[in-house]
Amino acid sequence: MFTLKKPLLLIVLLGIISLSLCEQERNADEDEESEIKRGIFPKIIGKGIKTGIVNGIKSLVKGVGMKVFKAGLSNIGNTGCNEDEC
């Protein structure tokens, strides 16, 4: 009985080791695929998104800037009090 336990234990250990190595190799392959996908996304789509965001911010700043400028011009002579009060 004892002589059967050693080879069985050896087979189980070798099986566990081989499964572990296969899993590590599979994980490495999945990491490479995800890196490739991440590398493609910013190059193709990222440029369009960046351009859209920058253009949107520029137009927003221009619109808000003009409103602030116009509001400032209308308030230049206005001190905030009536002529009778000051």
UniProtKB/Swiss-Prot annotation:
Disulfide cysteine pairs (residue numbers): 81-86
InterPro entries: Frog_antimicrobial_propeptide
Pfam families assigned: FSAP_sig_propep
GO cellular component: extracellular region
Keywords (A to Z) from UniProt: Amphibian defense peptide, Antibiotic, Antimicrobial, Cleavage on pair of basic residues, Disulfide bond, Secreted, Signal
Subcellular location: Secreted
Tissue: Expressed by the skin glands.
Signal peptide feature range: 1-22
Propeptide boundaries: 23-36
An example Gene Ontology biological process: defense response to Gram-negative bacterium
Biological role stated in the UniProt entry: Antimicrobial peptide.
Family under the similarity heading: Belongs to the frog skin active peptide (FSAP) family. Brevinin subfamily.
Protein's name according to its UniProt entry: Palustrin-3b
Lineage of the organism: Eukaryota, Metazoa, Chordata, Craniata, Vertebrata
